[in-house]
UniProtKB/Swiss-Prot annotation:
GO terms for cellular component: nucleolus; P-body; sno(s)RNA-containing ribonucleoprotein complex; spliceosomal complex; U4/U6 x U5 tri-snRNP complex; U6 snRNP. Residues 14-85 form the Sm domain. Gene3D superfamilies: 2.30.30.100. GO terms for biological process: maturation of SSU-rRNA; mRNA splicing, via spliceosome; tRNA processing. It is found in: Cytoplasm; Nucleus. Its main location: cytoplasm. InterPro entries: Lsm6/sSmF, LSM_dom_sf, Sm, Sm_dom_euk/arc. Component of the heptameric LSM1-LSM7 complex, which consists of LSM1, LSM2, LSM3, LSM4, LSM5, LSM6 and LSM7. Component of the heptameric LSM2-LSM8 complex, which consists of LSM2, LSM3, LSM4, LSM5, LSM6, LSM7 and LSM8. The LSm subunits form a seven-membered ring structure with a doughnut shape. Component of LSm protein complexes, which are involved in RNA processing and may function in a chaperone-like manner, facilitating the efficient association of RNA processing factors with their substrates. Component of the cytoplasmic LSM1-LSM7 complex, which is thought to be involved in mRNA degradation by activating the decapping step in the 5'-to-3' mRNA decay pathway. Component of the nuclear LSM2-LSM8 complex, which is involved in splicing of nuclear mRNAs. Keywords: Cytoplasm, mRNA processing, mRNA splicing, Nucleus, Ribonucleoprotein, RNA-binding, rRNA processing, Spliceosome, tRNA processing. PANTHER family: SMALL NUCLEAR RIBONUCLEOPROTEIN F SNRNP-F (PTHR11021), U6 SNRNA-ASSOCIATED SM-LIKE PROTEIN LSM6 (PTHR11021:SF1). This is U6 snRNA-associated Sm-like protein LSm6. It comes from the Eukaryota. It comes from Mycosarcoma maydis (Corn smut fungus).
Length: 85
């Protein structure tokens, strides 16, 4: 394996950098249960508790509910991804 292949991507930042960069942007939050919440990331804390605005709930890819604001407890979060919008 070449030395370049062993090096991490130089453009990859830390998870903390990613989270700071997506505040105020559209994100998808996947819960351990498989439910997705998509909305604007308002804030989060050190426990990964999340506040979303303009939130839409998806179950198995199907829109189920819309919420103005949603608060998600951090221990339920599997991952957060940035959305294109």
């Amino acid at each position: 394996m070449s030395a370049a292949a062993q090096q991490p991507n130089a453009k990859a930042g830390s998870p903390n950098d990613f989270l700071k960069g997506v505040i105020g942007k559209n994100v998808n939050v996947r819960l351990n249960s498989g439910i997705d919440y998509r909305g604007v990331l308002s804030c989060l804390d050190g426990y990964m508790n999340i506040a979303l605005e303009q939130t839409v709930e998806y179950v198995d890819g199907i829109k189920k509910n819309s919420y103005g604001d949603a608060f998600i407890r951090g221990n339920n979060v599997m991952y957060i991804t940035a959305l294109e919008k």
